[in-house]
């Protein structure tokens, strides 16, 4: 078993972590133990259709605690796309809420409306010794391209997040994002690491039930992507009891300057920290944070690296730029940088191809105080009359004048 596998402590009977669903608390140790009948002498490849429900999260924790490799996919993945993934990766175990009859798999058992399927004929797999997870690169499109994450990646990224956010054993979080999505997964992992408590909530943030659970269980934190905060802005937050919340994190894409300031001011009145973060699946989730005290003065900054490991490379030469405020590609260094990608089961034996270096594909710069900014994407550049122009910049300029933008093109010109 990997020395970096912090999930294995779940198997100890003194593990204190809990999952809350509805009005009940469940000890994670007890629930994971119920799945030990799935254990074999070899490491298994486990495909999990992820739901923000207790049994689904427990299945994920069981897989990693027992040194298996988990493939996490969205629960709403189309059946035909799922069949294609199964052909490409040939998992030993499938965990799904839907008893679809996948070829060459038998239903072993049903627990809490989740079906555990085992492959009829399972051969010997070759896995890289520290491989832990396969995370999708494209949401629910069913692409066979996955990011290969190691137990070492998970350990260092989770430890950094726990240390920065000061997560304690008495803290309680609530799920707001699919855990097949790296940001949602990292919130679960950080509270398993401590360990503390997780509320398995499968609804949206605009439902009354969400706020009832926050009040009932005295939730301390939750995370959101831009869409979640756009929805929250429509609500009158002053009408809800959020007194137990200590902080709220935002990642998964840039939030507008106006929204950052709006939520910073709204939450500040309630003594809640609003922390913006930057990350990617290839970095096992989060790479940087903006300290809350800079929300007003460096609003659009992604902040500083969790491991202080960013640099800016020249777009033409690839060499490091030491000047401030000069655009280049943002490059990240860290022990949380993924192993590489996979397209099929053969790739699961590959070793670390990235060696701790991630070229993000983001265009940005560093200011005189060492804070980093992202202005666009490398693949969002076009050349017009030999001039490189960033479509993100063009879009921002147009949005200053127009509320909506439509582009009409003919013959792909």
Label for each model-derived stretch:
Residues 24-25, 132-159:
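Conserved AMP-binding A3 loop
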Residues 219-224, 233-297:
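Gly/Ser/Thr-rich phosphate-binding loop
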Residues 304-307, 319-351, 389:
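Conserved ATP/PPi-binding loop(s) of AMP-dependent carboxylate-activating enzymes
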Residues 4-8, 12-41, 83, 149-152:
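Conserved AMP-binding/adenylate-forming core of the ANL superfamily
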